Curated annotation (Swiss-Prot):
Protein source organism: Halothermothrix orenii (strain H 168 / OCM 544 / DSM 9562)
CDD domains: AdSS
Cofactor note: Binds 1 Mg(2+) ion per subunit.
The protein's name: Adenylosuccinate synthetase
Subcellular location: Cytoplasm
Amino acid sequence: MGNKVVVGTQWGDEGKGKITDMLARTADVVVRYGGGNNAGHTVIVDGKKFELHLIPSGILYPEKVNVIGNGVVVDPEALVEEMNMLKEEGISLNNLYVSETAHVIMPYHRLLDKLEEKRKGDGKIGTTGRGIGPAYTDKVARRGLRVIDLLDEDTFYEKLKLALDYQNLLLEKVYQVEPMDIKEIMAQYKEYIEVLRPHVTNTSLLLDEAIKEDKKIFFEGAQGTLLDIDYGTYPYVTSSNPTAGGVCTGTGVGPVWIDDVIGVVKAYLTRVGEGPFPTELNNDIGDKLRDKGHEYGVTTGRPRRCGWLDIPILKHAVRVNGLTELALTKLDVLSGLREVKVCTGYRYGDRLIEEFPGNIDILSGCEPVYEVLPGWDDDITGVREYGDLPENARRYVKLIEDMVKVPVTIIGVGPGRKEAIRREKEVN
């Protein structure tokens, strides 16, 4: 297998949880490298559904080591809640490790996130309100607290006091709300710290040892390429790097140790929150995709905006991630449509644009140029061999491969882990 990375190629919600669960089963170590509990993976094992937001999906297999890397911003309350949920389901947590240098989401981060969205009004970004952005802001501004800072009570108090001097100034003077009390925060977080303490370690060293022992490592991505702070539809993005480059900075593993980068692409396109979406379908087809695909956020429950597959977006993801293969998910959701459209470029004024534009104002003014393919009526959820797919479904897959020059090696035909087609990497 080698060491693999799974990344989302779109605006998140591509079905990475299922693909991760499929591939992580052959790994020895499963690692989260960025984001926070704003992400959500749904994994179905033996008919039981697990919704994970922070903990790697390898936790469902007791023989695997699971790592939350330094690039993740950790909300102790959310993490402990997730740990308790897994314990209640009989899942062991002895194989879970948390980076000592991961930054911590504090109560003021969540409050500031919501207050800032409210202040922006119509100009809001559409965050999950979980404090992710403010936590990353403090990390870059060098005033954040890391997991290791919470382990010693005196150190925690001193660093929290310094942080609150700034945060309370912001809360009182800018947002006109009551300041936060240091004793209340200390008391609340003390409980979480004791639960997390046995799991905290230098995860970069742990991963280095795994590499030296020739263990297979699987890096589990969160969100998607178009939510990347550098390569996404800025400013309608997250505050981290969900792209493959985030693996190295978010785990302490060098790029030479990454063998494959698998891009997960949904057979149609979805988006949660604000921002331009050229292929969005505000019609019956969009509603059908949403209902049939159960397109509601795992983390927020918000209905997702739905549209046709966008090739310029996928080409962009191939380039910035260095994708070596694709996993196409939810092909079954397209069954029953009379025709299926694929955006191959954009019309902007009198110009034809075939690459994804970095200028969001241009993207907002783009009209999609479609290639129209005939649909298929067959129920494909039971198909396990590529050759058994309807001809028009195979034409759809081939069009994607021909346009982005990357092979589709996994095709999801249903929500279950086993409802998928596996193909060899070399595709004619």
